[in-house]
């Protein structure tokens, strides 16, 4: 899998084009934004259960041009305008943790639930912004129980998705920002860098990826 950037570029172009639309609270034709009725129609079209792939960047010692790995993943869109991923895999970010003790603790932990709020802002094609909540992992770190929180960028058009009503292809991009231990937000375990934030993209899709290889 070598073409994550191609996917992200295509999605980014669509998101940028849709930013001219704004949410509105009225059904008036004079509004340039998406109406409540259109939001309901978008939700009705997208809700349901999905299976596909999560795509994320990794190092590949065998091929310097191939930095993408994939895992199977399942998610659902609920009636309360949420994306729910019951088991978000730690493998999507483990390679970016340089603290070996933290990496081992997360590798041994159970996958955790991810909840992401959807904000529809374009009806045709269906495009939406994503507001992911932190994913909380129960871990044992240095012999003690802790909670590790995976935090994402939100309120940005880099966290978004699209849905094709004819093919039912669902695609979304999220940007991982930080991994914190308990309430300590002064140390970001992602990348183990001096910066307190990272920008690590992942993509989730049920598209046929073999067509893009």
For the regions a language model picked out, list residue spans one by one.
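Bacterial Sec-dependent N-terminal signal peptides
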Residues: 1-6, 12-46, 210-213
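First exposed extracellular module after export/assembly in secreted or surface-exposed proteins
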Residues: 34-213
